[in-house]
Amino acid sequence: MWRVCVRRAQSAVPRAGLGDRWAVLKDGPVAPCGSSRAGPGAARFSSGTPSYGVRFLCGWSSGSDTAPRNRLLRQLLGSPGRRSYSLPPHQKVPLPSLSPTMQAGTIARWEKKEGEKINEGDLIAEVETDKATVGFESLEECYMAKILVAEGTRDIPIGSIICITVGKPEDIEAFKNYTLDSAAATTPQAAAPTPAPAPCAAPTAPSAKAPGSSYPPHMQVSAVGEQRLESWKLRLGVHLSERPCLKEIRETAQDSFEVQEEGYLAKILIPEGTRDVPLGAPLCIIVEKQEDIAAFADYRPMEVTSLKPQAPPPVPPPVAAAPPTAQPLAPTPSGLPAGPKGRVFVSPLAKKLAAERGIDLTQVKGTGPEGRIIKKDIDSFVPSKAAPAPAAAMAPPGPRVAPAPAAGVFTDVPISNIRRVIAQRLMQSKQTIPHYYLSIDVNMGEVLLVRKELNKMLEGKGKISVNDFIIKASALACLKVPEANSSWMDTVIRQNHVVDVSVAVSTPAGLITPIVFNAHIKGLETIASDVVSLASKAREGKLQPHEFQGGTFTISNLGMFGIKNFSAIINPPQACILAIGASEDKLIPADNEKGFDVASVMSVTLSCDHRVVDGAVGAQWLAEFKKYLEKPITMLL
């Protein structure tokens, strides 16, 4: 619906700037749609408010200009009221929420550079969330005037301004030296400075839930401007009908804040009376199902670090202070900077080439915009022979310092958000879940024969793999032994009535577990199709959150690498994970002339949470699993 509103403004004043379009949206004859439901744009872009989709922002409120939705519409359209008066009309683009659990993101790559034209639907940047790398698109035609957050900047809070766009190319030059700090200094409000808003928090320091904890599907409602929260109109557990008054906030006037979808209020994160609630601060949690409320009793929003890029480590002070009249130890090579006084600006390609060639970027003079080092600088760089001289001309004797390692000895790989989440969840699992392991050998002879026949029948339509049989057998075994299809929920053990099998998939970004939903009622052909589609989307980083969040049982298969057996780590809050090894030909006793047969035997290991699944129960599950694979015809019963 947001796309519709913008298009209406553009059609009314096609050559107008963003500020003029704002006026049309607010007062003109073509008003925004007042529906509370989303149009096609909602699936393509989330607003700059954390976990607050476009569909929640559709329409112009009949209240004052400071009504929450109106204020955010004004911010996203770049109205004059939200810009510096000395600058042309422009739009401050905030970091959007790109996944239900996203609290902060990393700019993986800017797809548009400063000065470039951005067409409607163009990809602006790729953002690394806590789950995947996701791109977000522009909803209207504009120009990239200024990038405020450099590539690779980590832990950017949702709602933080990341770039500036303008409607006219001639306005780009005005933002050449634009920064968020300078913008604050030139706004009228700067004349009456106010104390910096304190972080919005409960009176006592929250004891955050263990890192990596998972929660049912939910929506995190966040502040759309600096506010004072006056009162909550609804209490925990109350059912929210469409567009109820949720809370009252105070800024220049007292307004009510509405939600646009049904649900249940599961958690209030900001108490009544809290002052200076900053933009993007999480206010409350809303869930779709009433039974999910209890899961958020100890929910705390994830803390994020400052928006500013991490500064390089400070240069250590000299070992011995030189006299005031002392001369430099050695002249700096001609044409080279004396040394970095801060961050070295370098393009991603140049940085990669420098690492491969062992080139010290501090010795390279950049010829790109504002001294940025580009590929041409790396290609033309010639190491100076005089460079080692400073090492020989040491300062007066002092404590010895270990020499720096030679270039190219190692590479520090930054930890991605996905890798950080994997580390947190696996650490939590090994430290808090009492694992035990059960192994068994399975004769795969019958499965291989059935698979061969089925693939002949499906020739040209796809193939069924051994892994598809394993998924189906696991799902049916979970129906027979439901304790293995359960979840530890701290206060209760949740026994699931459907089997959603998570399948571990290795991707360049890390491990992810897309889900085959309702595997117990799906046929082998459908399971095979689902697995191929999910694995492809996982490797391309195109999985949607609902496709990998949840699951009741997990399978990890390393048999294709020749691994005979291994023990997998449980994926909380699930109770079991099945590790699949490679199949091997083994001799087994047989009632024939030779007295033996050669069988393809596969070794599997079931990791169980002893809080949920006792040893005998785990053994029963493996017995059922083995029966289904050794007699695959029983899967039809």
Curated annotation (Swiss-Prot):
Mod. after translation: Delipoylated at Lys-131 by SIRT4, delipoylation decreases the PHD complex activity.
Record-annotated active site: 610, 614
Domain of life: Eukaryota
A GO BP annotation: glucose metabolic process
Targeting signal (transit peptide) range: 1-85
GO cellular component, one term: mitochondrial matrix
Modified residues (Phosphoserine): 99
Residue positions, PTM N6-lipoyllysine: 131
Catalyses which reaction(s): N(6)-[(R)-dihydrolipoyl]-L-lysyl-[protein] + acetyl-CoA = N(6)-[(R)-S(8)-acetyldihydrolipoyl]-L-lysyl-[protein] + CoA
Residue positions, PTM N6-acetyllysine: 456
Coiled-coil ranges (or none): none
EC number(s) reported in the record: 2.3.1.12
Family: Belongs to the 2-oxoacid dehydrogenase family.
Role noted for this protein: As part of the pyruvate dehydrogenase complex, catalyzes the transfers of an acetyl group to a lipoic acid moiety. The pyruvate dehydrogenase complex, catalyzes the overall conversion of pyruvate to acetyl-CoA and CO(2), and thereby links cytoplasmic glycolysis and the mitochondrial tricarboxylic acid (TCA) cycle.
PANTHER family hit by this protein: DIHYDROLIPOAMIDE ACETYL/SUCCINYL-TRANSFERASE-RELATED, DIHYDROLIPOYLLYSINE-RESIDUE ACETYLTRANSFERASE COMPONENT OF PYRUVATE DEHYDROGENASE COMPLEX, MITOCHONDRIAL-RELATED
Listed name of the protein: Dihydrolipoyllysine-residue acetyltransferase component of pyruvate dehydrogenase complex, mitochondrial
Organism taxonomic ancestry: Eukaryota, Metazoa, Chordata, Craniata, Vertebrata
